[in-house]
Swiss-Prot record:
This is N-methyl-L-tryptophan oxidase. Gene3D superfamilies: D-Amino Acid Oxidase, subunit A, domain 2, FAD/NAD(P)-binding domain. Belongs to the MSOX/MTOX family. MTOX subfamily. Its cofactor is FAD. It comes from Yersinia pestis. Pfam families: DAO. The keyword rRNA-binding does not apply. Its EC number is 1.5.3.-. Binds 1 FAD per subunit. Disulfide bonds: none annotated. Monomer. Coiled coil: none annotated. Transmembrane segments: none annotated. GO terms for molecular function: flavin adenine dinucleotide binding; N-methyl-L-amino-acid oxidase activity; sarcosine oxidase activity.
Length: 371
């Protein structure tokens, strides 16, 4: 059977691409090397922060606002509570470029934010210990997504829509020819008019020249009492340390607060090198300095997990067709901040499959910037 679209990699972005393409009436085949939602990619670990006033630059704001609207729409259609608006506090030095970008994004797109000095931070969230030169930009309408539930919901929706599913089936090659594009798997070869590659960390196994580097990362849950819960109005957070290293975290649930270090990690070249949490000495200690200085009331590490980032050289996304074949689109290089965008990126991919342009400017994410 020939398909209108084959999606390679059916995690967060891939499942969304399959969903929106099938909603548009396309004949879609979704392929994944595992059985999503799974632990092998970048969508596990229960939650992901949803920020609107974007510290990585205002070019992301139209995309993230579209993603938020689509997440809300999906939640309404399925009855699943995918997003929790607990608010997000962005903390950092008063000269932080990241916070300047947050403020600039909010101003340009008229997003509701509140800027607080260190005294106001301590008054509003007394569990935070902050230096005198720190400020916060609080986003009351932001929060977090339930990432595993979100992927599970998308997979269920595409299955009910009659989308072709080929899971636990690695892809070995993409072959272009005049009549279409062949996707070679261990189960056979499948053909499509268009192909979208959303293969996450291991995309270079299919596209070896793509400028993406896999990095092993970890996050962990720590003992935290009710002061750190949503019931006590404790928000999700990003914190920039004085050395510019960024940490992130979530309100405690069941007395466990999840947090991680955005920077750092271990360069890896294969899935076998993505060792479980605890296999590196720093896994259990890399957040200690942050906790000691900013959240000293948070307790011992209860558990942790490993994941992986697909890092681009500039940590901005790659959303483009391949120079050698414009019938193949790649969405990659999400660099540890991509999950929140999954619905919008999936919509962009589905529009590509219909020969329709993205209504949102994605030119900043083209491969041309690396040439």
């Amino acid at each position: 059977m020939d398909y209108d679209l084959i999606v390679i990699g059916s995690g967060s972005v891939g499942s969304a691409a399959g969903y929106y393409a099938s909603q548009a009436g396309l004949n879609v085949l979704m392929i994944d090397s595992a059985m999503p939602p799974h632990q092998a990619g970048s969508h596990h670990g229960e939650t992901r922060i949803m920020r609107h006033a974007y510290g990585e630059g205002e070019k992301y704001v139209p995309l993230v606002l579209r993603a938020q609207a689509l997440w809300d729409q999906l939640a309404a259609q399925t009855g699943e509570k995918l997003f929790q608006a607990c608010g997000v506090i962005n903390l950092g030095p008063d000269n932080s470029t990241f916070l300047q970008n947050v403020q600039r994004s909010a101003q340009q797109y008229d997003l509701p934010v509140e800027t607080l000095n260190s005294t106001q931070i301590r008054e509003k969230w007394p569990v935070f210990t902050v230096p005198d030169n720190y400020i916060a930009v609080f986003e009351p309408q932001s929060g977090y997504l339930r990432s595993e539930l979100a992927v599970k919901t998308l997979i269920k929706a595409v299955t009910e829509a009659g989308c072709g599913i080929l899971f636990n089936c690695p892809v070995t090659a993409i072959e272009s020819h005049q009549a279409g594009v062949d996707v070679v798997t261990i189960d056979g070869t499948y053909s499509a008019t268009k192909v979208v590659v959303t293969a996450g960390t291991w995309v270079k196994e299919l596209l070896p020249t793509l400028p993406v580097t896999p990095v092993r990362k970890v996050f962990s849950w720590h003992q935290a009492d009710g002061r750190y819960s949503e019931a006590n109005h404790f928000p999700a957070f990003t914190v920039e340390m004085p050395d510019n290293i960024l940490y992130y975290g979530f309100p405690a649930q069941n007395d466990a607060l999840k947090l991680g270090k955005h920077h750092g990690g271990q360069l890896i070249e294969s899935a076998a090198q993505r060792k479980p949490f605890g296999r590196y000495a720093e896994d259990g200690t890399e957040v200690f300095s942050f906790l000691r200085h900013f959240l000293p009331g948070v307790g011992v590490c209860l558990r942790g997990e490993a994941c992986s980032y697909d890092m681009s050289p500039d940590e901005d996304f790659i959303i483009d067709t391949l120079p050698e074949d414009e019938r193949v689109m790649v969405v990659s290089g999400l660099s540890g901040h991509g999950f929140k965008f999954a619905t919008a990126l999936g919509e962009v991919a589905a529009l590509f499959a219909q020969d329709k342009p993205s209504p949102i400017d994605i030119s900043a994410f083209s491969l041309a910037r690396f040439r």
